[in-house]
Each structure stands twice: as C-alpha cells, then as structure tokens.
C-alpha cells in the first residue's frame, strides 16, 4: 500500500481546502516543484496532484505547475485530477510526463467517455469518485447526485480503468479519520483497486486501512495531516512496507 502525498493547486499555490470549499483554504507554499521535492525526499513513491481551479472551471488552470513537477521527476508516478474533461487535456498531460489522469465529474455525467479514454490511453486512466454518504458528488463537490459510488465503480471495472480514487468529502480536510467501511466496501464490491482519500489524520488511519488492504486498497492519499506534521510520510510508508513483507513471508 502506498502513502501518497497530495499537492492541491489553487492560483499556482499549494493549498488545502476544507470539504472542497474554495473559500476555506489554507496555503502551505507558493512553489509546487519545491513542495513535490519535499515529499519525494521523505520517500514518497507517487504524488497526487489536484488542479482545484480546474475542477471548478472544467478545464486545466494550473497545468504549468503540474507539468513542471512531472518534468522535475520523470521517473515518479504522478496522478492529476481536476478539470480533466477532454481527450486533448489527457493527451497533453501524458505527453508532459504525468502517469495517470483522474476523470471525476465527466465520469459521472458521461460514463461512456471513460471507456473511450481507456481504449485510447490504456493503463493511464483513474476514475475519481467523490461521495457524501455513499452518493457521488460532482462539479468540485458542489452537486450531489443520486448515484451510489459502488454502483458506478462496477460500471468502470470492465472499461480498463486503472483504479478508483475514493474521497469521502464529509471528511476531506477535516482531520476526522478515514471512512474505512465505505472504502473497503467499494474495493470489495467495485472490482477495482481503490486509493483512499479524505480524512487521513495520523498513523492509526494508515494502520486501519492496512487491516482491510487485502480487499483491494492500493494506497492512501494524505494532505492536511502531513502538512501539519501529524503524519510522517516516511514512517507511514515503512509501516506499509513492513506489513507487506510480513504477509509475503
């Protein structure tokens, strides 16, 4: 299981939002490449980037910062979400060196688009499902649909989607712990590896996810906890590696 630092980009700065509210953000730095370097130096093996402006505007806004990070670390898997709604955007990011693109709102509104992109860019497409009380939210979390996250995940399992990034938006940025039950249920029933997001607060949350990792938990994205020093990326990754070694022995 991977511990994946999040770098959320708003107006070219590194920020964290509370529950997806653009008017409730904390700024942690104004140099995205330097922030990426910080997490790489702690041993991060993948980075999760989010173009927050892009998520709300429906098109890339912070692509320059994303590209700069990808070019600075060409061997590091990088996933980007926010404003990815066209094949042209996906192609541009992949050509810039990004490893995975996360389709969120567009996946909910136009599921056929996901299958088309998986065929065109095999192995590079992740679907981001943001949910409140099990129901999928779209448009930068501004709208909550009547679709259940588990049901939607099942649709994408046959399309060739690489994995699901699952965010419990009631907990994201609130330091309230991961929704373990919902994450494990999605992994078991959705048929795809799941990257947990939202609510990772301390090492105990990583330990709790490790308990259900066999259900298909690929990793855990963490933001505010690592920025505020409540979770050490290196320590958390060592714990994951040790657990894996124990299971293999």
From Swiss-Prot:
Keywords: Amino-acid biosynthesis, Cytoplasm, Histidine biosynthesis, Isomerase. CDD domains: HisA (cd04732). It comes from the Bacteria. It is found in: Cytoplasm. It is an enzyme of class 5 (isomerase). Transmembrane segments: none annotated. Pathway: Amino-acid biosynthesis; L-histidine biosynthesis; L-histidine from 5-phospho-alpha-D-ribose 1-diphosphate: step 4/9. Signal peptide: none annotated. It catalyses: 1-(5-phospho-beta-D-ribosyl)-5-[(5-phospho-beta-D-ribosylamino)methylideneamino]imidazole-4-carboxamide = 5-[(5-phospho-1-deoxy-D-ribulos-1-ylimino)methylamino]-1-(5-phospho-beta-D-ribosyl)imidazole-4-carboxamide. GO terms for biological process: L-histidine biosynthetic process; L-tryptophan biosynthetic process. InterPro entries: Aldolase_TIM, His_biosynth, HisA_bact_arch, Isoase_HisA-like, Isoase_HisA-like_bact, RibuloseP-bd_barrel. Its EC number is 5.3.1.16. GO terms for cellular component: cytoplasm. One of its GO terms (molecular function) is 1-(5-phosphoribosyl)-5-[(5-phosphoribosylamino)methylideneamino]imidazole-4-carboxamide isomerase activity. The active site is at 8 (proton acceptor), 130 (proton donor). Pfam families: His_biosynth. PANTHER family: 1-(5-PHOSPHORIBOSYL)-5-[(5-PHOSPHORIBOSYLAMINO)METHYLIDENEAMINO] IMIDAZOLE-4-CARBOXAMIDE ISOMERASE. Belongs to the HisA/HisF family. HAMAP family: HisA. NCBIfam families: 1-(5-phosphoribosyl)-5-[(5-phosphoribosylamino)methylideneamino]imidazole-4-carboxamide isomerase, PRK13585.1. This is 1-(5-phosphoribosyl)-5-[(5-phosphoribosylamino)methylideneamino] imidazole-4-carboxamide isomerase. It comes from Chromohalobacter salexigens (strain ATCC BAA-138 / DSM 3043 / CIP 106854 / NCIMB 13768 / 1H11). The gene is hisA.
